[in-house]
């Protein structure tokens, strides 16, 4: 039965299949997200210790939440020693790593071979895909192609690259030197939440240019 006279909006709270089914069948606006394919990009100029700590938290603090990092992107000029330390940190915490060819050549241990499917997989588990990119532009292109506009983070000491990343990724929440798991309402100062929306529409009332502009939440850490 059509319930549009009684229900203004639906906010599904549950697993991926529930949210997908509600979005497919619902005749009223739906607020929410289907998947959280979140990324962390490590630039070539970073605080090495901070990068390791942020990546470990972003992936392993709670692997089953939508804000967990599922893909790690690494600048091609990031020191090989640092890449090995980060990946070893993940492996030592029982994280299964799916890596592209370039990463597998750099890392001294055994890694699983990444496929195209891995770049669009929300693992919700102790698993992560890792890819080498040539610059921040390629990182942004990868995120906008495979991501779900949830939460994505750049780790860098370069303010120009940080600003480019923040302005060009399409995510609802954009991080600089911050774990993607720092994305809930309480942590951002909004109090309790019923979900995280990746929607850009709808506006209400007269629709002009301002009403057609969406926003992103930007979180910057030192």
Where on the chain are the PLM-derived regions?
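A structured beta-alpha segment of the ubiquitous adenosine-cofactor-binding alpha/beta core
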Residues: 1-7
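Short, structured coil segments at secondary-structure junctions
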Residues: 6, 26, 93, 169-170, ...
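Residue-level signal for inorganic ion chemistry
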Residues: 10, 75, 139, 191
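ALDH superfamily catalytic-core signature
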Residues: 19-125, 176
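Short, well-ordered beta-strand elements within core beta-sheets of diverse protein domains
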Residues: 72-74, 125-134, 149-154
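A C-terminal functional module that forms or caps the active site or interfaces directly
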Residues: 150, 154, 159-170, 178-180
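Internal helix-turn-beta structural module
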Residues: 171-172, 180-213
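Conserved small/polar residues in nucleotide/adenosyl-binding loops
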Residues: 218-222
């Amino acid at each position: 039965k059509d319930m549009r006279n009684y229900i203004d909006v639906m906010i599904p709270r549950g697993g991926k299949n529930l949210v997908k089914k509600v979005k497919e069948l619902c005749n009223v606006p739906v607020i929410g997200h289907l998947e959280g394919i979140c990324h962390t990009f490590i630039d070539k100029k970073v605080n090495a210790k901070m990068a390791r700590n942020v990546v470990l938290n972003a992936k392993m603090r709670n692997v089953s939440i939508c804000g967990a990092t599922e893909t790690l992107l690494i600048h091609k000029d990031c020191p090989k020693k640092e890449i090995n330390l980060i990946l070893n940190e993940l492996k030592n915490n029982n994280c299964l790593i799916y890596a592209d060819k370039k990463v597998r050549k750099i890392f001294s241990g055994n890694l699983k071979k990444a496929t195209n499917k891995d770049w669009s997989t929300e693992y919700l588990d102790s698993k992560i895909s890792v890819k080498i990119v040539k610059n921040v532009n390629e990182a942004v292109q990868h995120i906008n192609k495979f991501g779900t506009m949830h939460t994505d983070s750049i780790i860098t000491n370069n303010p120009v690259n940080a600003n480019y990343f923040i302005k060009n990724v399409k995510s609802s929440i954009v991080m600089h030197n911050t774990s993607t798991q720092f994305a809930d309402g309480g942590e951002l100062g909004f109090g309790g939440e019923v979900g995280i929306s990746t929607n850009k529409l709808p506006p209400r009332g007269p629709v002009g240019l301002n009403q057609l502009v969406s926003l992103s939440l930007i979180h910057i850490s030192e």
